[in-house]
Regions:
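Catalytic cores of large soluble enzymes that bind and process phosphate-bearing ligands
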Residues: 14, 58-61, 135-139, 205-212
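Phosphate/diphosphate-binding loops
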Residues: 32-45, 52-55, 155, 162-167, ...
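Covalent nucleotidyltransferase
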Residues: 48-57, 63-72
Length: 212
């Protein structure tokens, strides 16, 4: 069952730290690594007053795409304080090597709808793919309806962070430890984790819907 998921799934990470390890592991299993980098995007790196920061996912289509991902990541974390804007993203862009996706959570749609931001990203240099999900969160349906205003054919996806629903508390504990901040103490009762209130981000949930 896990192999079935791996053959159909994509690995999306917030950094490139685990890329080489992931490539080695998939090669050992005879699988093709389909890798995406989730990164923050802002309207303008020059505008220090801009409060709009949202997530995008950039997938590498080939080896050249991996090189471009590395350049984008390096720029964002050396000159962009962890983010990139349209001007600099377009500089490294190639539709032949990269694919841009708008994730369901933490995207500009999410930020505008649920956090009253005013994000106006410029994706004119490419054609993004929009994702939707259903993880039994109270705002999933509202957000999905809003996504449909930007894209008539979004792709249904599933974020998987742990194996079984019973592993949710262990995952939550891990995230609390990783996100410790001196000024904002995290606990299981108050983990300070956005939309971390569902046990549906599991492989078990995906299998129930796809392996019947």
């Amino acid at each position: 069952m896990c192999i079935s998921l791996l053959r159909r799934g994509f690995l999306v990470e917030d950094s490139l730290v685990g890329f080489l390890e992931a490539r080695k592991a998939t090669e050992e299993k005879g699988l093709k690594l389909r890798f995406g980098l989730r990164i923050s995007m802002t309207d303008s790196l020059q505008d220090k007053e801009s409060s709009c920061v949202h997530k995008i996912v950039i997938f590498a289509k080939n080896s050249e795409g991996c090189k471009r991902l590395n350049k984008i990541y390096s720029f964002a974390f050396t000159k962009g304080n962890g983010a990139i804007d349209q001007k600099h993203l377009e500089k490294y862009w190639s539709d032949d090597d990269l694919k841009l996706a708008v994730p369901f959570y933490d995207s500009f749609v999410f930020e505008n709808l649920l956090k009253f931001s005013s994000c106006i990203p410029d994706f004119s240099f490419t054609t993004p793919t929009y994702f939707t999900e259903d993880n039994n969160l109270p705002f999933d349906k509202i957000l999905e309806a809003k996504v449909s205003e930007y894209c008539s054919s979004p792709v249904k996806t599933k974020s998987i962070y742990y194996k079984n629903r019973k592993d949710f508390e262990a995952f939550q504990t891990y995230k609390c430890l990783c996100a410790r901040q001196f000024y904002k103490k995290a606990t299981l009762e108050n983990p300070n984790l956005d939309h971390c209130s569902s046990t549906e981000f599991s492989m078990e949930s995906w299998l129930e819907k796809n392996e019947r």
